[in-house]
Amino acid sequence: MRSLSSLPAGLVLLGVAFFCGCAGIAPEQSVNIAPPEHVADNSVKGWWAVRFRMNWPEDTPPSWYMDTLIAHRVVAPTLDHYQDRIDLWRFHRRASRDSAGHQFSFIFYTDVASARLITDEIRNDALTASLIRSGSVRRVLSEDPETITKPGIAATSDPVWPPAVQQAWPYFIDGVSRSWLELVEQTVQRSRPSVGDMSISALQDYYRTVDKEVQEAWETQGRHAFLHHLNAIFGYAPVVVYEKKYMKF
């Protein structure tokens, strides 16, 4: 994957809240994902999502490394293939003891024909099938690629936000997702494992290590590399955080 140093400065991943088999895995391929340009609302384009629901046994923590594995080995190659057709995209990570459970989502803005191709490629990926067979992934959900239900750039932003924030946020979270994926890529590049012969279990073990290293980078460098520079973009103005107090980074 190409370095994301050309992305808008100050983009940061905030609030990341974000199994066994024996099938061989296809060799990894590097990807090259270009940054977004400004996108106008378009009646022939809209938002779609492909969602992976993980196996999450009771009394165990979420397997966050599964998000990392799927993002890097399933979604990233598709992003590379269709980057000229995808205007904006992002990842969404969540885990709660409800019907969705631990769910990793790839959300993207494109036209109907491209949505169909992108959705089909992800759903029909050999690794997707292996993860389902192994029981690591319970279900893969996707929206009807023939129907645009969320046409505006702001259509998937939080409706409680002011309109300007709704319209700007998709660019922010696009950059956040790219930065996180680049961290994953850089971590993988340092070790360069021979993944072609890995079983599903071995691949999961490897991405558990990758995910841990990415989390450590966030824990040790996130305050300055991400939060401080994000605060700088806004002129070091204070911000109301969850605890309802002002902070600067």
Set out the residue ranges of the language-model regions.
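An acidic, charge-biased composition feature
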Residues: R2-S3, G15-F249
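Bacterial N-terminal signal peptides that target proteins for export
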Residues: M1-L11
